[in-house]
Swiss-Prot record:
<feature type="region of interest" description="Disordered">
    <location>
        <begin position="690"/>
        <end position="712"/>
    </location>
</feature>
<keyword id="KW-0813">Transport</keyword>
<feature type="repeat" description="HEAT 9">
    <location>
        <begin position="517"/>
        <end position="556"/>
    </location>
</feature>
<feature type="compositionally biased region" description="Polar residues">
    <location>
        <begin position="694"/>
        <end position="706"/>
    </location>
</feature>
<comment type="subunit">
    <text>Adaptor protein complex 4 (AP-4) is a heterotetramer composed of two large adaptins (epsilon-type subunit and beta-type subunit), a medium adaptin (mu-type subunit) and a small adaptin (sigma-type subunit).</text>
</comment>
<feature type="compositionally biased region" description="Polar residues">
    <location>
        <begin position="808"/>
        <end position="821"/>
    </location>
</feature>
<keyword id="KW-0168">Coated pit</keyword>
<dbReference type="InterPro" id="IPR050840">
    <property type="entry name" value="Adaptor_Complx_Large_Subunit"/>
</dbReference>
<feature type="region of interest" description="Disordered">
    <location>
        <begin position="725"/>
        <end position="867"/>
    </location>
</feature>
<protein>
    <recommendedName>
        <fullName>AP-4 complex subunit epsilon</fullName>
    </recommendedName>
</protein>
<feature type="repeat" description="HEAT 7">
    <location>
        <begin position="397"/>
        <end position="431"/>
    </location>
</feature>
<dbReference type="InterPro" id="IPR017109">
    <property type="entry name" value="AP4_complex_esu"/>
</dbReference>
<feature type="repeat" description="HEAT 5">
    <location>
        <begin position="321"/>
        <end position="358"/>
    </location>
</feature>
<dbReference type="InterPro" id="IPR002553">
    <property type="entry name" value="Clathrin/coatomer_adapt-like_N"/>
</dbReference>
<keyword id="KW-0653">Protein transport</keyword>
<dbReference type="GO" id="GO:0006886">
    <property type="term" value="P:intracellular protein transport"/>
</dbReference>
<dbReference type="GO" id="GO:0005905">
    <property type="term" value="C:clathrin-coated pit"/>
</dbReference>
Amino acid sequence: MEQLKTIGRELAMGSQGGFGQSKEFLDLVKSIGEARSKAEEDRIVLSEVDILKRRLLEPDIPKRKMKEYIIRLVYIEMLGHDASFGYIYAVKMTHDDNLLLKRTGYLAVTLFLNEDHDLIILIVNTIQKDLRSDNYLVVCAALNAICRLINEETIPAVLPQVVELLNHQKEAVRKKAIMALHRFHRKSPSSVSHLVSNFRKRLCDNDPGVMGATLCPLFDLISEDVNSYKDLVSSFVSILKQVTERRLPKSYDYHQMPAPFIQIKLLKIMALLGSGDKNASDIMSMVLGDLFRKCDSSTNIGNAILYECIRCISCILPNPKLLEAAADAISKFLKSDSHNLKYMGIDGLGRLIKISPDIAEQHQLAVIDCLEDPDDTLKRKTFELLYKMTKSSNVEVIVDRMIDYMISINDNHYKTEIASRCVELAEQFAPSNQWFIQIMNKVFEHAGDLVNIKVAHNLMRLIAEGFGEDDDDADSKLRLSAVESYLQLISEPKLPSLFLQVISWVLGEYGTADGKYSASYISGKLCDVADAYSSDETVKGYAVSALMKIYAFEIASGRKVDVLPECQSLIEELLASHSTDLQQRAYELQALLALDARAVETILPLDASCEDIEVDKDLSFLNGYIQQAIESGAQPYISERERSGMFETTDYHPQDHHEVPTHALRFEAYELPKPSVPPQASNELVPVPEPSYYSESHQPISTSLVSERESSEIKLRLDGVKQKWGRPSYQSTTAASSTTPQAANGISTHSDAGVGSSSSKPRSSYEPKKPEIDPEKQRLAASLFGGSSSRTDKRSSSGGHKPAKGTANKTATVPKENQTPVQPPPDLLDFGEPTATTATAMDPFKELEGLMDSSSQDGGSSDVMGLYSDAAPVTTTTSVDSLLSELSDSSKGNSRTYQPQTSKGPNTKEALEKDALVRQMGVNPTSQNPTLFKDLLG
């Protein structure tokens, strides 16, 4: 019965298309596979893209359908088309709780996105959540995504959780955690520098898979610093020995070879640790010998391990037995019919030649067979081996074979490499000068402009300086052979430009040196070169310079110079050339022909091309001229640095330029909101001292102290700040423009000293334009609050002018007895912040009670408390003259002593509390009627 159910499920899957996919998807794959052209394939894929764009926009797509759509998007991307419109759906699928859908989403995301994509930030939180999952398959899926997508900026978000997973109970999770840390080390070594010890610990893991994964990061670490891991040599050797003895589970075997990939990685690590270390090499020798005996050379994986053993032996200190075993393995490789094994044999032979050159002689015939093999890759590898085998006895044969091969190939890159190797071998092992010149001529002739220009310069320097044996005859023969060979080649129809430059330079320097060839003959050849390659300005420039040298040597030797007609026509042509370089060379040649022998010999000495030229950067030869000019009254030279007045400021910069950036992405969770605390009054930022009143007799002494104390306190600058609450009202504008205390009602106030003392310059250019005040409102305010208006007018009239010191001191010395300072009447229309005054211990309410009593006695001052009574409103037609008279009377009357009296009307404290509440809440008056305060205060 169960078998029938299984068959039924398989038939159902087959009807759907197999593997849970729809028949529509399989038809898509089939149609693309049967496409006969790239255009037909593109048409099918673009049609599928249009279908998916419409399908993905449909609402309430079933998860099974969405999974199929994501797989189809992956298939479209694999074919090289853009499916970026569906990336976000793959990201959303990683959030699904279903394991199959989540893994599908992670697979698609790792294929769609790269580490710098903008959508990476959207899956970081999902990865963090999945790393904490109880299902180890979900954790593995998240770790796979980390190994592909996490960049340097997002490493700190997942690093702590990955480190915790190193101790997970599942070996698959531990293995993938090691792989994730390896990626972190490659992307940002500094982020995991403190976690390197974890790699050492996981090397001893019970699971071979975790241990094998640890070898990869350890290989990178050892490549960077070998000495720090010398203590692990015995551990690696022990692990390799256990692997070769088949102590690992059978599941790690590959083609009956025990854990071959772990063996290969261990051999690479041992090659690094044993380089130049005799003790480490001795420890490794035994297990390496066992590998040569146990490896099966009949399989590719066995040959791979043998090849890695040969590489390891070539790196550590030599051991005769190991070298013999390696030579036998190489012999098997070279005798094989497989080109791959021959290639491995040639490469291994090239490595062992450095240790024992005699090994190559045992395989001469095999090397020649590889050199004649039609496989181009094998032939190139053989030439690399010949290059390493070259010495004086075989240099001619090897270089000739290399030049023949260079002529036969069309690969410019490899042709350039072969040419440079031929030049290098000819310079090191040339048996004669003539052979050297011939080889160089062949290289330049056939490689042409592919030869590096440094090779041409080195050749010219070698011809000029000789072989450095202080043998002038040998050097002369070398130059003569070069001139003769170049005169033969110069008639060739097509020569490379670089070779022509070398020919022109050599003929100009040494064409007439031995007297075998006349100047007219050499100059004629050079003119032919310039005429044949008229489109190449560089060659023509070298030819003109060579003519200049030939004529200079003739003039310096005292011989008569006969300029050939073709040379004269060439000079005339170049004098009118569009090239400034050729024109300059022609003018110099023309001027040189008119000089005498002594001048020419000084300008162009014979065979001085390699003489060292000392450049006097300080122009010390002008010191005498400069001193003479200064003595004659000339101004000394001032350097540009001294003129600009700039100095080095590097000492003032911090030395550590590698500061950790303070602005970075934060991936930790937000803090929970704290319960709200009712605000409390605080005076830490803006302390507002209580008002104090000093007698005029003590004012001069305390003024400076108060100013200094207030200037040191922290205060807000409210001048020029637009008020948010209340109707626009008239405000004083001189608080910031003057630091002189202003007198109000006969008493000097220092409410603005803290602000004004910080700056004595007016801030009108920085303050915003104040709104214009209606004149009717000004008259109303003046009629209601005479004292405040007088103070405002007085400040505005005297703002920006500082009174003389003598006047202030004189006023301060007038004795005043039993005077009680009076607070100016409050400006109830000012709903702004109160101005700061000097702190005092007096009760402000008692002071205001005294103010009311004095106001009731003084007929010249306005009754402030009467505003809160039911008295008739004051008319707004009060004249300005009467207002000024009231101000003068109030200022005079304030000097009298006031006696406290019983106040009439409403309670003073209640009225002030209401007034303070109104100031705080910012209630706007509804009309210009003076009884508005009755509405506000009740």
